[in-house]
Amino acid sequence: RHAAPHARNIGLRGPLGWPMLLRVARLLILPLMLALAALAALIAGGQIVLTPRWDPFAPFDVAETPGLLTRFKFARTRADGNLCRAALARAGVAFEPVPDRVTGEGCGFSNAGRIGRLSAASLASPVILACPTALALAAYERHHLGPAAASFLNSRVARIEHLGAYACRNINHAATGRRSRHATAEAIDVSGFVLGDGRRLTLTADWSSSDEARAGFLRAARDGACRWFGVTLSPDYNPLHYDHFHLDTGGGRACR
């Protein structure tokens, strides 16, 4: 029941203990940083040619299967209006740029466009979205909605139904408080889906459905949205979201 006299110090002061490991780590950090910087310079200068999938400087491609660099390329593309619009064009998304506007206190949009169709699915009606939000929606449709519909329902998503996108209003339509991300065209409220075979699913009717395929698809749709949107709110969040997914790219983080 009694530990050896020095047992408590083993691993802390031994030749491979934490102090030694920390010293080794400090010695390696600078060479590693220099090596990475040199590698980045060679790639940027064209001396090392990588395939687009492994090139961190290649534009984000909606059609490309997500990999280790997807997050980096997605963030870089979202931050650059020209890259963002080019990525949507390559994906076959009908994104019609609209002039920047200020429509009220804390309301308006920049780098936005009117969008009515994604790569494979249409929107029930065209909406105005900021380009980064449209890009997230396009990637979401390609990599999560389509596969989820095939897996759970043996069909495809033909149309995305929604309750709107841009609107100059506060969060939850409150009379006072912070502006919603809808006020800057950085959010869309998705209320349902129409499949290629004509079936229609809505959050109101199918979120708690006894039909496991329908309910499973909607939960997979919610979980997939969390991969591309900073904030995804579903009926699990609160009663105000009983009939839609709130999807926004305004900078917050939530997946509920």
Feature locations, PLM:
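Active-site acidic/histidine clusters and adjacent loop/turn architecture
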Residues: 73-160
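Short extracytoplasmic/periplasmic juxtamembrane "stem" segments immediately C-terminal to an N-terminal membrane anchor
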Residues: 54-76
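Active-site-adjacent substructure of cysteine-protease-like catalytic cores
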Residues: 151-185
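Second-shell loop/turn segments in exported
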Residues: 69-75, 127-138, 176-177, 203-212
